[in-house]
Curated annotation (Swiss-Prot):
The gene is cat-2. It is found in: Cytoplasm, Perinuclear region; Cell projection, Axon. Disruption phenotype: Reduced (30-40% of wild type) level of dopamine thought to be due to defects in dopamine synthesis. Defects in serotonin signaling. Affects mechanosensory behavior including foraging and exploration activity. Hypersensitivity to odorants. Blocks the enhanced slowing response phenotype caused by bilobalide, a neuroprotective plant chemical. No significant effect on lifespan. Shows rapid reduction in reversal rate during tap habituation that is rescued by exogenous dopamine. The lineage of its organism: Eukaryota, Metazoa, Ecdysozoa, Nematoda, Chromadorea. CDD domains: eu_TyrOH (cd03345). This is Tyrosine 3-monooxygenase. Fe cation binds at H347, H352, E392. GO terms for cellular component: axon; cytoplasm; perikaryon; perinuclear region of cytoplasm. It comes from Caenorhabditis elegans. Expressed in dopaminergic cells. Expressed in neurons in the head and middle body of the hermaphrodite, and six neurons in the tail of the male. Expressed in ADE and CEP neurons. Belongs to the biopterin-dependent aromatic amino acid hydroxylase family. GO terms for molecular function: iron ion binding; tyrosine 3-monooxygenase activity. Its main location: cytoplasm. The modification Phosphoserine is found at S35.
């Protein structure tokens, strides 16, 4: 489970979680687990709230600039923003929808053209639609701020039957909007994506298992402070875990052991066995992150990066694009080893690491990360939901039985048994459907998505990616650990050049194999 998803891993009974530190969380219903889905939804609503507050303020400011107050009463919120952000020098392109109860459409159109012309607004396109009660006219226009305001004032004053005046910014497939959304282009820029924005702390919530434990709180703060200091290029420090922490790790490790044999997918079992054989994961001692990274780098190129808690959904997903997983370093409280109200190191190591050792699951996680770069808030929320339901709580079919592939299940004894039972509903994994699935969290989840295999899930995810409306594509360069945005033919040529070199080597190897076979 990522430090981003701040999940409550339930082993016995449901427990509430109060999330502190952000106004969004304070105003939200306290969830049983503070999930990636919940976080992304909160961020979307938070941004919408900010935009709404700005619009209200801008509407007040425009009151002093516009003589006819009737316009402001009729004008939509987007229209307010179009006018507010325009200037008197550079013309902008926009659309207007006008509605009139004038029984004669020709009179309405005539008034529009006359008043727009008087205000020197350039009309590029006109469409009309009418019925018995009213007429609608859509116009594509070009004008400066003063010209736009003047045309609105004239039309409102001269056409008394006008009932609707809506302005919309020109949409260029959201290209300009999305191109302005910052995202990291090099792995070093993940330093800007590692700020913890929400914390579920034992210092603030009495329902946290560690609440009131001064030693645990101090230990947790020490580990979080270390994580905050980590920067790209730093060697991940050695953590001297206490005997109490090792005992907590062992208790969870051994309790999940038998269940892992019967309830988890073959990929997980195979990689867990290798991790155990190579002594990366053992029951007695908590592994060091840097040792785990050496293993992952050889297997799939993934690596763990220390962070202090909950990141934004956008930042967490962006990290996956570089095959970086932001991980907490603290452990759950020793008095509640089989229940964690948030992601902790035990979840990261027992849930995610064996799955990140699989090339297909690693690729699927990176694909979700790449899809998130430059995406809108709405798409971030959808991608977070897909990630949650497949990478964290996904199931697959093996030999006619349900097996866990999601890290949230693989590290949670109680929910793992529940998910694979007949109690919840199970649906075939379809990213388009999963992306809009409402997340329920009053108790164990009532619904889980099931993939035929990890390969099947990856194929469906890539098909879903092709349907996303984004004005550019991105390619990850593993040599420089950087992201290339493909926006022009020149960018495409560069990407093809690298692909051509790889294909040449593969073709050469294939030719040699043919020669060997014929001999």
């Amino acid at each position: 489970m990522s430090s981003l998803t701040n999940n409550t891993f339930m082993e016995e009974e449901p427990r509430g979680v109060t999330v502190i530190a952000t106004k969004v969380a304070e105003n939200s219903k306290n969830p049983r687990r503070y999930s990636l889905v919940h976080q992304a939804s909160c961020e979307t609503q938070h941004h919408k709230g900010i935009r709404r507050q700005n619009t209200i303020q801008h509407r007040k400011q425009l009151t002093d600039q516009m003589r006819c107050q009737k316009i402001l009463q009729q004008l939509n919120d987007e229209g307010i923003e179009v006018i507010f952000t325009a200037n008197d020098v550079t013309p902008i392109e926009f659309s207007i929808i006008l509605t009139s109860t004038d029984p004669t459409l020709s009179n309405f159109v005539s008034d529009i053209l006359q008043n727009m012309s008087s205000a020197k607004v350039q009309i590029c396109h006109v469409e009309t639609r009418g019925n018995e009660a009213s007429h609608d006219v859509l116009l594509a226009c070009k004008a400066t701020k003063n010209q736009l305001i003047h045309s609105a004032e004239l039309l409102t004053q001269n056409h008394v039957a006008l009932t609707k005046f809506s302005i919309f910014a020109k949409k260029l497939s959201d290209e300009k909007n999305q191109s302005q959304i910052w995202f990291p282009r090099h792995i070093s820029e993940l330093d800007q994506c590692s700020k913890c924005i929400t914390k579920y702390e034992p210092t603030t919530d009495p329902r946290h298992p560690g609440h009131g434990d001064v030693a645990y709180i101090a230990r947790r703060k020490f580990l979080n402070d270390q994580a905050l200091e980590f920067k790209f290029g730093d060697e991940i420090g050695y953590v001297d875990y206490t005997e109490e922490e090792h005992a907590t790790w062992k208790a969870v490790y051994e309790k999940l052991g038998d269940l892992h044999l019967s309830h988890t997918c073959a990929v997980y079992r195979q990689n867990l066995k290798i991790l155990q054989e190579e002594k990366v994961l053992t029951a007695d001692r908590i592994p060091q992150i840097r040792d785990v990274n050496k293993f992952l780098q050889k297997k799939t190129g993934f690596e763990l990066r220390p962070c202090s808690g909950l990141l934004s959904a956008r930042d967490f997903l962006a990290s996956l694009a570089f095959r970086v997983f932001q991980t907490t370093t603290y452990l759950r409280h020793h008095k509640s080893p089989h229940h964690s109200p948030e992601p902790d190191l035990i979840h990261e190591l027992l849930g995610h690491v064996p799955m990140f050792s699989d090339p297909l699951l690693a690729q699927m996680s990176q694909d979700i990360g790449l899809m998130s770069l430059g995406a809108s808030d709405e798409h971030i929320e959808k991608l977070s939901t897909v990630y949650w339901f497949i990478v964290e709580f996904g199931l697959c079919k093996e030999d006619g039985k349900l097996k866990a592939i999601g890290a949230g299940l693989l590290s949670a004894y109680g929910e793992l048994m529940h998910a694979c039972s007949d109690a919840p509903e199970h649906k075939d994994f379809d990213p388009a459907v999963t992306a809009v699935q409402k997340y329920e969290d009053d108790d164990y989840q009532p619904l889980y998505f099931v993939a035929d295999s990890i390969h099947d899930a990856l194929a469906k995810l890539r098909k879903y990616a092709s349907s996303m409306d984004r004005p550019f594509s991105v390619v990850y360069d593993p040599f420089t650990k950087s992201i290339e945005a493909i926006e022009s033919s020149a960018d495409l040529e560069k990407a093809f050049s690298r692909l051509s070199n790889d294909l040449s080597a593969i073709t050469h190897a294939a030719d040699r194999m043919k020669i060997s076979i014929t001999m």
